[in-house]
A protein has these predicted regions:
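A short, hydrophobic C-terminal helix/tail in secreted or cell-surface proteins
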Residues: 235-240
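Short boundary motifs at domain starts and secondary-structure transition points
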Residues: 1-2, 169
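C-terminal accessory "lid"/substrate-recognition subdomains
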Residues: 157-234
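Residues at the beta-strand->loop junction immediately N-terminal to the Walker
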Residues: 12
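Nucleotide-state-sensitive switch-loop elements of NTP-binding domains
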Residues: 3-9, 17, 21-165
C-alpha cells in the first residue's frame, strides 16, 4: 500500500501577532484531523509549546506536540526539523502536520528545506513523505497600523536585513495566506490600506480578517495553496 504524503501548514508571523492563538483555535476545532505540531522557540524554554500542550490534551489520541528549541528551524535547526518531519510522517499516526515557526524565523529557508527533502527523495526514486500545503503569515493589524503606517513603511527601502521591518516584509512576501489578526482594532480605511500594502508585497496572497485567531479551518488546512513549481527559482539549501 502506497504511503500518503502528509500535508504541512507552515505558520509564520512576528512575536505577538497571534500564531499560538490561531494554533490553539485549530486544536479545539480540528474536525477529525489527526494533527502533529512542531513548535519552534529560539530559547531553552518553549513557552508556546506549553500553551499548546494544554489544548492538545483535549485530543490526546489525535494530537502530538514536538518542541524544537535553542535555535531557528530556518537555519541552525534545519536538520532537526527534517528528522522530526520524517519521524512524524513515518509513524502513520497523523494526516496533517502544522509547524509554528519562531517569530524571528524567515519563511523561505524553511520552505527550501522541505522542498529539498522532496527533491532528494525523488532523485532516489522514493515517494515523498510530506509536502507543503499552505504558508500562513499571521499579521497584527493594530501593530501594522500604529508602528508601520498601515504597512506603508514596509514598502520603503531597508538596508538592514536583520531589522524588524525586513523580517515582517519577508514573512508577508513569502506566504499563501495572510491572517489579518486583531482586525477589530483598526477602522475600515486602515484595513483597506493594510490590505493594499500586503497585495503589493505578495499579490497572490489571500487575506482573511480575524479576531482572536477565529478562522474557518477549511480556509487553512488542505488548501493545496503552496505550489512548489512556482518556487523552483529558489536556491536549495545545504543541510548539515
Amino acid at each position: 500500500m502506497k504511503r500518503k504524503s502528509i500535508p504541512i501548514l507552515l505558520l509564520t508571523g512576528y512575536l505577538g501577532a497571534g500564531k499560538t492563538t490561531l494554533l490553539n483555535h485549530i486544536l479545539k476545532n480540528q474536525e477529525g484531523y489527526k494533527v502533529a505540531i512542531i513548535v519552534n522557540d529560539i530559547g531553552e524554554i518553549n513557552v508556546d509549546q506549553k500553551l499548546i500542550d494544554k489544548n492538545a490534551q483535549i485530543q490526546k489520541e489525535d494530537t502530538d506536540v514536538v518542541g524544537l528549541t535553542n535555535g531557528c528551524i530556518c537555519c541552525t535547526l534545519k536538520l532537526d526539523l527534517l528528522q522530526q518531519l520524517s519521524a512524524l510522517a513515518s509513524s502513520n499516526k497523523f494526516d496533517y502536520i502544522i509547524i509554528e515557526a519562531s517569530g524571528i524565523c524567515e519563511p523561505i529557508p524553511i520552505a527550501q528545506t522541505i522542498t529539498y527533502a522532496n527533491e532528494t527523495l525523488y532523485s532516489r526514486g522514493l515517494p515523498e513523505l510530506f509536502h507543503l500545503d499552505n504558508i500562513i503569515c499571521v499579521a497584527d493589524a493594530a501593530r501594522l497600523s500604529n508602528e508601520f503606517t498601515c504597512g506603508k513603511h514596509l514598502l520603503e527601502p531597508c538596508e538592514d536585513e536583520d531589522s524588524l521591518d525586513s523580517l515582517l516584509m519577508q514573512q508577508l512576501e513569502f506566504c499563501n495566506t495572510v491572517i489579518l489578526n486583531k482586525a477589530e482594532t483598526v477602522n475600515e480605511n486602515e484595513k483597506n490600506e493594510i490590505k493594499a500594502v500586503i497585495h503589493k508585497l505578495c499579490k497572490d496572497a489571500g487575506i482573511i480578517e480575524a479576531s482572536f485567531g477565529q478562522v474557518n479551518l477549511e480556509e487553512l488546512l488542505n488548501t493545496h495553496n503552496f505550489d512548489s513549481v512556482s518556487y523552483t527559482h529558489l536556491t536549495l539549501p545545504t543541510i548539515r
